[in-house]
Amino acid sequence: MSAYCGKYKDELIKNAAYIGTPGKGILAADESTGTIGKRFASINVENVEENRRSLRELLFCTPGALQYLSGVILFEETLYQKTKDGKPFVDVLKEGGVLPGIKVDKGTIEVAGTEKETTTQGHDDLGKRCAKYYEAGARFAKWRAVLKIGPNEPSQLAIDLNAQGLARYAIICQENGLVPIVEPEILVDGPHDIDRCAYVSEVVLAACYKALNEHHVLLEGTLLKPNMVTPGSDAKKVSPEVIAEYTVRTLQRTVPAAVPAIVFLSGGQSEEEATLNLNAMNKLSTKKPWSLSFSFGRALQQSTLKAWSGKAENIEKARAAFLTRCKANSEATLGTYKGDAVLGEGASESLHVKDYKY
């Protein structure tokens, strides 16, 4: 049997290509209730549904922002929420030319017999949930696998379990009309150098595409969401140009040309760092058969959150900060960002959280 060719085939290909449109990218607004609670705590905002809804309305209804986005990843709660005027967020996004997406994994669990390595859960009722989300207007999905670099990590067991888990998720999504974002995140935690990150990234991505192939996943109807290839959080930093070179080389060696787009996670980089690194990749004149874009959460929202601080009177200021980051990242997907965005408070601070849980 070859790749998936069921009733959603053409729609999957069209939607995946659209999300990868140069000049556009993805806002990851799918933080779990617990994670958004930590963000709110940092700005002294209570973690209740109305505040979560207000933040999402602030983002999705920022005038001019949606032109820079092709997709927004939602948490299940947000998929069914509305603006204060009663308009479903899904409709707001669609009218702005943005595809709604949905986080479908149910978090990580430890793999017994390993050094606290993890695999991701959520396969059991996944088909049923995907069908329900498609019905509600979602057109793509996200599933995060997490690997770490250590003296003996990632183990072959963790690599294989996570690759197989991602592939199972991907084919179930496609059978239910959702474009799967395949996210094998290799955490930045640790003192390793960029060569070690590049090597591990190659091994992990090769395993993922082998598994996707074995599960007959239609690659043209998928997206990859990898980490950038960088030194560990406790190692000496390198320039965006070096990160770009290592990252693109790693992708050239592992990601088939059939994949329409690669949308990077920011992995705790500061807002400005993530944008500069993406820009450097798009400036590289080398073979890139896929578009290189963003799927940023913290790196699109940090200065916006700080400007807002949960106060209605700060909404305009917060929206200006959000628009600035959306525009900067849009330019970075074209390799035209000049590093001239007005930096809001928090735009250049590291957003790294050790052993980050989404």
Swiss-Prot record:
<keyword id="KW-0324">Glycolysis</keyword>
<protein>
    <recommendedName>
        <fullName>Fructose-bisphosphate aldolase 1, cytoplasmic</fullName>
        <ecNumber>4.1.2.13</ecNumber>
    </recommendedName>
</protein>
<dbReference type="GO" id="GO:0030388">
    <property type="term" value="P:fructose 1,6-bisphosphate metabolic process"/>
</dbReference>
<feature type="active site" description="Schiff-base intermediate with dihydroxyacetone-P">
    <location>
        <position position="225"/>
    </location>
</feature>
<dbReference type="InterPro" id="IPR000741">
    <property type="entry name" value="FBA_I"/>
</dbReference>
<comment type="similarity">
    <text>Belongs to the class I fructose-bisphosphate aldolase family.</text>
</comment>
<dbReference type="InterPro" id="IPR013785">
    <property type="entry name" value="Aldolase_TIM"/>
</dbReference>
<dbReference type="InterPro" id="IPR029768">
    <property type="entry name" value="Aldolase_I_AS"/>
</dbReference>
<dbReference type="GO" id="GO:0005737">
    <property type="term" value="C:cytoplasm"/>
</dbReference>
<keyword id="KW-0456">Lyase</keyword>
<keyword id="KW-0963">Cytoplasm</keyword>
<feature type="binding site">
    <location>
        <position position="298"/>
    </location>
    <ligand>
        <name>substrate</name>
    </ligand>
</feature>
<feature type="binding site">
    <location>
        <begin position="266"/>
        <end position="268"/>
    </location>
    <ligand>
        <name>substrate</name>
    </ligand>
</feature>
<dbReference type="GO" id="GO:0004332">
    <property type="term" value="F:fructose-bisphosphate aldolase activity"/>
</dbReference>
<feature type="site" description="Necessary for preference for fructose 1,6-bisphosphate over fructose 1-phosphate">
    <location>
        <position position="358"/>
    </location>
</feature>
<dbReference type="GO" id="GO:0048364">
    <property type="term" value="P:root development"/>
</dbReference>
<comment type="subunit">
    <text>Homotetramer.</text>
</comment>
<dbReference type="GO" id="GO:0005829">
    <property type="term" value="C:cytosol"/>
</dbReference>
<dbReference type="Pfam" id="PF00274">
    <property type="entry name" value="Glycolytic"/>
</dbReference>
<feature type="binding site">
    <location>
        <position position="39"/>
    </location>
    <ligand>
        <name>substrate</name>
    </ligand>
</feature>
<comment type="pathway">
    <text>Carbohydrate degradation; glycolysis; D-glyceraldehyde 3-phosphate and glycerone phosphate from D-glucose: step 4/4.</text>
</comment>
<keyword id="KW-0704">Schiff base</keyword>
<dbReference type="GO" id="GO:0006096">
    <property type="term" value="P:glycolytic process"/>
</dbReference>
<keyword id="KW-0346">Stress response</keyword>
<feature type="active site" description="Proton acceptor">
    <location>
        <position position="183"/>
    </location>
</feature>
<comment type="function">
    <text>Fructose-bisphosphate aldolase that plays a key role in glycolysis and gluconeogenesis. Involved in gibberellin-mediated root growth. May be regulated by CDPK13. Associates with vacuolar proton ATPase (V-ATPase) and may regulate the V-ATPase-mediated control of root cell elongation.</text>
</comment>
<dbReference type="GO" id="GO:0006094">
    <property type="term" value="P:gluconeogenesis"/>
</dbReference>
